[in-house]
Amino acid sequence: MIRSILTPLVSPRFLTDIRYREGHLRVVNALPQRRVLGLHVPEMQQTAKQISRCGAEVELSEGNRKKCHNGEEVIRSFETVPNDSLCHEEIVIWGYLINLEKCTLPERLTMLEKYVPVLDNWAVCDSYCANAKWMAHANKHELWAFLQPYFRSTREFEVRFAIVIAMTYFMTEEWLPKIFEHFNTLNIPRIHSAYRYEKGKPNLPQQGTAQGPQPYYVRMAIAWHLATALAKYPALTRAFIRTTFLPEDVIKLYIRKARESFRTREVAVM
């Protein structure tokens, strides 16, 4: 949709250095059908800021171009095009534009309702969540209510979205027990993942594989959240771990994440 704006920003090294390109694609690990142009976060952030201020000419379909005069009009255009026509970077920038809008909380949440179902990759999801600084100042009760359907979703990255937002903006003594309650009631086997489990690193990048049982990116998000909670609220976290119904593999991932972090490598995990 805005690929004509993004393509000139791609690093020549991404286009010419096979090892560099494969390294980038392995980190992003987009699904095979999702095109990745090769832009990095700072470039996408700068592009989003420019579009938010000045708008952009967008391509809604082949030969059907439209001039959008501001970020909101570009967001509305993103909402109308088929999801599978968008590249990885376009989806990331769509999310950044939502974060940059000057609007009310209900208006922003309405935009998010159309955006969250498009998330199909950990990098898109986590990049959006880290960039959503407005959530730190939003009405927490309204925002928490908005997250509830995503905690209960059967789609991998809708659930991951709720978990990462909770970790980033609800990591307090007040909210942590509510988050733990959600973890205990997650029906992990019924969460669908488009990634298939494959041991070891695939020979080629972007093969639609993950190095753990489905839904791998939900399991990893829970482990990441728990390891982060251990750093801030060790007693609360250990009490939850001792009584949780989470699968054993998720607990092992949590322990591994805790041991990898300099903040918790010497902290008791159980």
Language model features with spans:
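Alpha-helical scaffold domains
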Residues: 1-270
